[in-house]
Amino acid sequence: MATDGASCEPDLSRAPEDAAGAAAEAAKKEFDVDTLSKSELRMLLSVMEGELEARDLVIEALRARRKEVFIQERYGRFNLNDPFLALQRDYEAGAGDKEKKPVCTNPLSILEAVMAHCRKMQERMSAQLAAAESRQKKLEMEKLQLQALEQEHKKLAARLEEERGKNKQVVLMLVKECKQLSGKVIEEAQKLEDVMAKLEEEKKKTNELEEELSAEKQRSTEMEAQMEKQLSEFDTEREQLRAKLNREEAHTTDLKEEIDKMKKMIEQLKRGSDSKPSLSLPRKTKDRRLVSISVGTEGTVTRSVACQTDLVTESADHVKKLPLTMPVKPSTGSPLASANAKGSAAMARPGIDRQTSHGDLIGVSVPAFPPSSANRIEENGPSTGLTPDPTSSTPPLPGNAAPPTAQTPGITPQNSQAPPMHSLHSPCANASLHPGLNPRIQAARFRFQGNANDPDQNGNTTQSPPSRDVSPTSRDNLVAKQLARNTVTQALSRFTGPQAGAPPRPGAPPTGDVSTHHSVGRTGVKTHGVARVDRGNPPPIPPKKPGLSQTPSPPHPQLKVIIDSSRASNTGAKGDNKTVASPPSSLPQGNRVINEENLPKSSSPQLPPKPSIDLTVAPAGCTVSALATSQVGAWPAATPGLNQPACSGSSLAIPTTIAFCSSINPVSASSCRPGASDSLLVTASGWSPSLTPLLMSGGPAPLAGRPTLLQQAAAQGNVTLLLMLLNEEGLDINYSCEDGHSALYSAAKNGHTDCVRLLLSAEAQVNAADKNGFTPLCAAAAQGHFECVELLIAYDANINHAADGGQTPLYLACKNGNKECIKLLLEAGTDRNVKTTDGWTPVHAAVDTGNVDSLKLLMYHRVPAHGNSFSEEESESGVFDLDGGGESPEGKSKPVVTADFINHANREGWTAAHIAASKGFKNCLEILCRHGGLETERRDKCNRTVHDVATDDCKHLLENLNALKIPLRISVGEIEPSNYGSDDFECENTICTLNIRKQTSWDDFSKAVSQALTNHFQAISSDGWWSLEDVTCNNSTDSNIGLSSRSIRSITLGNVPWSVGQSFLQSPWDFMMKNKAEHITVLLSGPQEGCLSSVTYASMIPLQMMQNYLRLVEQYHNVIFHGPEGSLQDYIVRQLALCLKHRQMAAGFSCEIVRAEVDAGFSKKQLLDLFISSACLIPVKQSPVKKKIIIILENLEKSSLSELLRDFLAPLENRSAESPCTFQKGNGMSECYYFHENCFLMGTIAKACLQGSDLLVQQHFRWVQLRWDGEPMQGLLQRFLRRKVVNKFRGQVPPPCDPVCKIVDWALSVWRQLNSCLARLGTPEALLGPKYFLSCPVVPGHAQVTVKWMSKLWNGVITPRVQEAILSRASVKRQPGLGQTTAKRHPSQGQQAVVKAALSILLNKAVLHGCPLPRAELEQHRADFKGGSFPLSIVASYNSCSKKKGESGAWRKVNTSPRRKSGRFSLPTWNKPDLSTEGIKSKTLSQLNCNRNASLSKQKSLENDVSLTLNLDQRLSLGSDDEADLVKELQSMCSSKSESDISKIADSRDDLRMFDSAGNNPVFSAAINNLRMPVSQKEVCPLSSHQTTECSNSKSKTELGVSRVKSFLPVPRSKVTQCSQNTKRNSSSSNTRQIEINNNSKEENWNLHKNEHLEKPNK
């Protein structure tokens, strides 16, 4: 110890120095405590105290931070080799006072602390080890349990082997039966052989007959061959005559053409002397063209825009490459040209067209076309022919410019020339330009300022640079043009400065707005120098031509972009549905194609069209650029004007036609004569190669002929040039060219409204006609320029003017489908009845092109009362909407045209209906057919009707056109209003509508009626919503209800009787029309005929069952019908009595029906008097009566059967004088009576089952039970409601997805679910028959009506019955002395709670569940149903084992066991004697379930319902045993998985609870599900012997095994086996169990025999 102490001394650094020195010296000696001095002992004591303090500090630090310190040390933050650092850190951190003594740094104390911690860790690990050992023990126990399960498995396997052995025995028995059956099969085979032998004999006989028949056929074929030979001879002769007729007709046509040619030659020679061409070049080219035309194989001579340096080639290949070319105009005075034109017109007319080609504004001079050129032209676009169809695809406007439909592309009118087009004009009202400014100077400045769209000298728009090098001549011309433009612009700038005194142009917006007017040729070309000037200034200078500017032109955009941009810039333009010109993408650069649809029409009358030059192939009506129109005096047109599109410059037949960009392709400059153009404007426009010398000479150049320029300006819409020309003196504004086209005509034809207004204001002749008789109004109407038409009408143009062919403006507008023009003309009062020389009317024209809108306007548009005053709103709105936006006009008004007008025939005898039918225009034909006066049987000159020439679609339309739609109805005769339940039966039902056509025969009509009836019977008796077309059946197959065509008594066509197969002299159609039959009525055979077909149809009870009931009455005489209230017992009995009466009367007996209604006061004495007075009971002394008597006793349930019928049972069963019965009369006398054989007794009971003493009566009658879940009641409601739906839909069966079908299915499911739930509750007296649901309203589109009806039914019928039934059941035991009535009047609180819970569950599970209404609407209607707000959590939380104090466990077991026995599940605890264990277990589970349900419900509901739940729980626990069973049954209904789930309906309501967990717990669900759950017959084991003896009537064991209600729940086989085993084990228990159930629930005992047949006691 001295050594240890010495070893400690050097570590005491905190001791004083003297003490340290003394300790060091003492270390040399042996350490002895006794030798220490007092000071040394003090020092030692202080050292030990310091060590204790250090240890305490270490312990506290380790306790406080044991986990953190060890974690830090583990991760290397502190080293275990030096724990002193940690101690020092903790000490310094914990002690803020520096004077505190440092901790002892003795390692022993530190190690002790570490060891203490290690001990703790060791203890913890030992505890974990102990836990692991316990888990090991549990694992071993589980292994033992697994072994036990394996043993059980082996036992089950052994049992399985036993079952297999039993199955083998069954198989052996089946094998024996198979052997027996095989023997029978051999016998049958032998019989079959005999039959086959007989069949062979019959076949031999038939073969002989066939041979004879074949011989007869051979003779008949020989006769037919002879007939065919004669017919072929006749055909040959007819064809020869036809060929001869055709030759004569062709010769006549040739002669007519020669006459026309001679006439036109004379006219042309006369005009030729008047016209003096001023240029020599046209004559020169005219001669060239004559040569080219006369050669039939040459291609059309063309000038192409794309040709910049080369001369025009005269090959057809060039035509193929350049789609925008034009044939050279032939000489107007040449007979050869006229002949060629005539031939071409004949070529162009399609064979189906029944007009001549002259009828559509088509001229007479046309160049001939070689076939090769035609073929190549077709390659450029989807052209349908060489020329447009004048009657179908082309506007009948002079020149066939642009077809209104997409049948012909825009290139066709150029390359394939129909007769020349006569330029059509459009008038303008006022034109005021600057009067102070010289129009010539203004026009010149307007012209010479560059424009991006102007063509260069080769006709190319300079938007696209040429794709190849420009020739030297072209370059020279380019320089010359630039120089000319610069010079003239400078020279004219003096005259065109702003003038202060110039009046403003009214309504003219700045013309520099390129986006509005450059719709035609400007795409992507940015205009340079667009100047916006004030309205008082002259027109602004257009942009310079890119060809003349110093900036290079942008590249040529793609064609698609051109079309789109022109369409995008089309502001204020109205499309007229014209052809979209779509040339191929390989167009030469510089060519342009315009869509007429996209052309703008100026919105202001004074607004001149913006210059745009790229008008290559535009259809008629295009805006021609102002720039182009100023280039007067250029090369002449290549073709007559009307053969070109209306907007092309060459459309005017003038010697010096305006040259414009690509429609006329000028020859290269080298081929032009210097003197070809002598006009300054022409020279400056860049078209003449001699531009530079003329400009340098400084002399003025004279302008060309003013009338020619006037027409050019009008045709191309150049308002500026037109104003300049109109201001000159001496100008003839009515001058006509050689084709008769005036300036007004050209402007109107091309749709230039401003030009038309200017010309009309200048007093141009508004009705000036061309050589074919077409006026400007004709041209504007044909082209669809409705603004021009409106102007011309306003200037009193002749709206009924007829051209040479008789075409009026209305006819031309109808021909081209221009509905705006048609509307304007009709409102102006034009005559619709004017006919052409071919006999065509405007209706013919509209129908010929298939234009429905035009036809509707002609037939229905009425002339407004305000006459010719048109407002903008009226012109836009019209009388009705033709675009389909509104109702069809024919639906609102009657046609305004007469029948004669509609039926008018043309020269060939064709009416408009003929044309529409032959071309397949079904819509047009349908509109014509809506006119009541249309004669579809009208025949043409070939004796063909409209039907004969119609296409298949139109034939179908015509066949159904005059078809009579007559409803077919089924009548069941008169039903007595007093009949029970007959208020809901309809006497007549419409089953379908028959279409009777003119060609319908009586055989077809008979088949249609029979098939319609059979289909209807099949449809209403099918299981689903099958349409009449889906029902495939024939007349011989009966429907499920037994009705067929054999059930018909008679058929009336209107008021005329008719039978199937009967024929009249007239056809069915004529017969119906003559007799004005509005319906066909089928009467079914009824009781008056001794049949029950009408009863079957009225009540939907199958005919076979009704016949069985009638047979029972006839055979047994005493029959009682019973079933739930509303099962139609009284109706069935009355109809059977009526049928029986008529059968007896037909057999020669007199018969009488006596009916008595039984009530509570009906006594046996009254019944006796009834029998005696009706001669059913006759005295023994009296002889039998031959009269038949039928007694009906209704409402027998209101009286006691045993008391009422007890004395009559014996004589009723033994009807003879040998077994009399003595009855005492009212006077006290007694006499013997007996029932005779001619008396029939029928009764009705509105009860589902008999009980008590009434069962004594059962064996003396034949009973017919009308069960709700068996036929006929089960399917009656479904069939009845389906028939009601069919009647509501006029014979059509709606699809299953229709809301009406859904609401009807819901009503049907409500009835079934309601009865199912009531049966489960053990209240059969509350069951409902289908009678209450027959009045279910069927209102398509109004499902709410049905829901409201259901709420009234629930509140008025169902709720009182359920309350009464539950109260009567719950009060049977509780108040035996007071009786049921007292209990019903004063129900206890527990009974009230049970009733409310039952109503709430029934409402949610049976009624509201499955309602097709949306959830929001259903919530609104929920308040209409009474009893739906009861908190269902009370039912779920009800303590199933709560009982009164005086009750024992055995008593409860006796009460509930029978109901459990009839259930599907049986508790394993039944086999145990200790019931308290079961009760505790069930109680615990019930409380657990309640808690889980409470957790699912809302907190607010819990707070509100806690007290209510507790109070009602106590009340329920005070109730009777039946109440407890009712509540258990309610719990099982709530938790049942197969029943409808309440949570789906009312999970959002606060007062409803979920019950899902009840079914999830196996023990609890078994406990509540096995209560009163019905089972099907196959699943229930036979009842034990003591149960059988307790039944009221002796029935076999198997009969009693039938359950009350069919279960909708799946039954596991293991549970059924378990049930049977438990039944056997409990069979030795006392009989009190069955006695209890029989005494307290008689109706339940009756329900056990539900599926039993009614006739068993008497069998």
UniProtKB/Swiss-Prot annotation:
Domain of life: Eukaryota
Signal peptide feature range: none
Compartment(s) where it occurs, according to its Swiss-Prot or TrEMBL record: Cytoplasm, Cell cortex; Cell projection, Dendritic spine
InterPro entries xrefs: Ankyrin_rpt (IPR002110), Ankyrin_rpt-contain_sf (IPR036770), Cortactin-Actin_Reg (IPR050719), Cortactin-binding_p2_N (IPR019131)
ANK repeat segments: 705-735, 739-768, 772-801, 805-834, 838-867, 908-938
Region described as Disordered: 1-23, 324-436, 450-474, 495-612, 869-893, 1443-1478, 1613-1659
UniProt-listed CDD domains: bZIP
Disulfide-bond pairs as recorded: none
Transmembrane annotation, as ranges: none
Function: Regulates the dendritic spine distribution of CTTN/cortactin in hippocampal neurons, and thus controls dendritic spinogenesis and dendritic spine maintenance. Associates with the striatin-interacting phosphatase and kinase (STRIPAK) core complex to regulate dendritic spine distribution of the STRIPAK complex in hippocampal neurons.
Subunit structure: Interacts with CTTN/cortactin SH3 domain. Interacts with STRN, STRN4/zinedin and MOB4/phocein; this interactions mediate the association with the STRIPAK core complex and may regulate dendritic spine distribution of the STRIPAK complex in hippocampal neurons. Activation of glutamate receptors weakens the interaction with STRN and STRN4.
Name this protein carries in UniProt: Cortactin-binding protein 2
